[in-house]
């Protein structure tokens, strides 16, 4: 849902530069964010926009944008937790920086990035006890990997593959799992704050709302 909110705005601005598109993505994903991972994704997009320095981006520029994305997302979260989308973003950024100077072409470069992202995602199952108990990887991290895989697919084919929704009923069976998780707040509340004051102590504000 978060990405869907951004797709419409990007589609209307296809002739814009990479920098312009990243700015549109940052704004659209923030306003359309759904859930914790959606909000973090919007901060990743914000970081990408901050990390890009011009209308075009070479591999080192892309790597810098990835790093800026991870750094921005970590700073935006009051209590960053490893084994989540944050870990996948950080380790993907580290991989991008590593491969940026290897003389690869665009497809090879992004293949390395996607492979690294998938490896990072696989490890999330063994970092968070809740994920290990359930036998699953982090959902937000998986979403980020899917976005990167989509970018790679477009680089390879130059085409966007539209996925049609299935109207065929499908019966599935699943075994319920009793997962014991120490979750204090079992719901997600989101709100946007329009800041009119010019000089605001952001850290003081965060410490105040953190109580609630």
Specify the residue positions occupied by each region the protein language model found:
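N-terminal loops that bind phosphate or other acidic moieties
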Residues: 1-212
């Amino acid at each position: 849902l978060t990405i869907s909110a951004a797709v419409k705005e990007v589609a209307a601005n296809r002739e814009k530069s990479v920098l312009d598109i990243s700015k549109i993505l940052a704004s659209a994903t923030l306003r359309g964010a759904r859930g914790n991972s959606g909000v973090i994704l919007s901060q990743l997009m914000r970081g990408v926009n901050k990390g890009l320095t011009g209308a075009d981006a070479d591999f080192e520029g892309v790597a810098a944008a990835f790093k800026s994305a991870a750094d921005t997302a970590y700073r935006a979260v009051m209590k960053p937790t490893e084994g989540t989308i944050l870990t996948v973003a950080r380790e993907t950024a580290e991989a991008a920086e590593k491969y940026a100077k290897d003389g690869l072409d665009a497809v090879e470069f992004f293949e390395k990035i996607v492979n690294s992202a998938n490896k990072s995602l696989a490890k999330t199952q063994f970092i968070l006890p809740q994920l290990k108990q359930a036998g699953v990887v982090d959902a937000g991290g998986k979403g980020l990997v899917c976005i990167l895989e989509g970018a790679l697919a477009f680089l390879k084919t130059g085409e966007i593959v539209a996925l049609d929704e299935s109207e065929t009923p499908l019966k599935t069976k699943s075994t319920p799992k009793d997962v014991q998780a120490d979750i204090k707040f079992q719901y997600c509340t989101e709100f946007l704050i329009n800041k009119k004051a010019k000089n605001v102590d952001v850290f003081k504000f965060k410490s105040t709302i953190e109580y609630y």
